[in-house]
């Protein structure tokens, strides 16, 4: 009787899994665009932010392929499909404001929360949480128990491998984006980003009217 119950339980589990909507990503599921990562070298914070605390000042930055997320009903899958774009050059995923997609532990909020991570090299990385590291795999909802990574970039490994290079074992960026200059450094500050644009933010544009003469420069600058 006990054996029969075990068999029935296995059948029930298998049947349940069979109804979970899993789906392999296709090109029609995501948007493709261009992200200029060079602007991160002199990145200016656009939004107001407040201290989120550094849960671990680690430098390791691993990665995962976004196509590993296949549960269509999950917050991760839905958020990626609705809000993220794949950079056809670097393979990084980014949102409408240029925040890079990454997996973070529960210490750093929920899916869709955004952060500024400042590195020891002075670099500011705008990060949006698009996947959640399992609490079973991280210490204190923070760093991965095995590799110590706080930030795990969510990427398209095909494009990223071509752009950042691969090691002999096939790992993108030799398995650690800390090997890439723009991402090199340990975390010295983490800030939670709000939706409010900072009053000190100045956006520079390149499409200035070249036909403005000296007499009208004052009126142009005044908005008349």
Whereabouts are the PLM-identified features?
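Solvent-exposed, well-ordered loop and adjacent helix/strand elements within mature globular domains
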Residues: 27-224
